[in-house]
């Protein structure tokens, strides 16, 4: 997986209308967040900071156990760093998701699940603002939000925390067999 260094640079590509991350060695990452969801400072060139590297490491560790390919994990972690630094504030769109009976207060970089009447998917928490969280989808398969709308890998959505469930891997994987 990628290892951040002090040569990485954020910049905005006007031709592609996209935030980019120059990774050095002729490698460039195109951030998956639409330009309309980025704060104005995303259009200015700036370095990938020590804070960015620390946040990247947290995301990388929390997605390491997910059943997606290593390149997808790197893509997810880089998009999550970009979202944590450059995503505009947004209003919750909780109506797509089912209210949960158990309250959840997720931490940044936690893996959580959200359920619609049409399915369920895993997300990573980008920012918990108290009663709502900005989340990024981690599942590769799209999740139908309604009959006409879906959310895809690395798309972001803000939801009230009462719609979020903590993600738990199969309990069987966490149990030790005895005797």
Swiss-Prot record:
Domain of life: Bacteria
Compartment annotation: Cytoplasm
Keywords from the UniProt entry: Cell cycle, Cell division, Cytoplasm, Septation
GO CC annotations on file: cytoplasm
UniProt similarity note: Belongs to the ZapC family.
Function: Contributes to the efficiency of the cell division process by stabilizing the polymeric form of the cell division protein FtsZ. Acts by promoting interactions between FtsZ protofilaments and suppressing the GTPase activity of FtsZ.
Protein name stated in the entry: Cell division protein ZapC
Coiled-coil portions: none
Main location as per UniProt: cytoplasm
Oligomer and partners: Interacts directly with FtsZ.
GO biological process, alphabetically ordered: division septum assembly; FtsZ-dependent cytokinesis
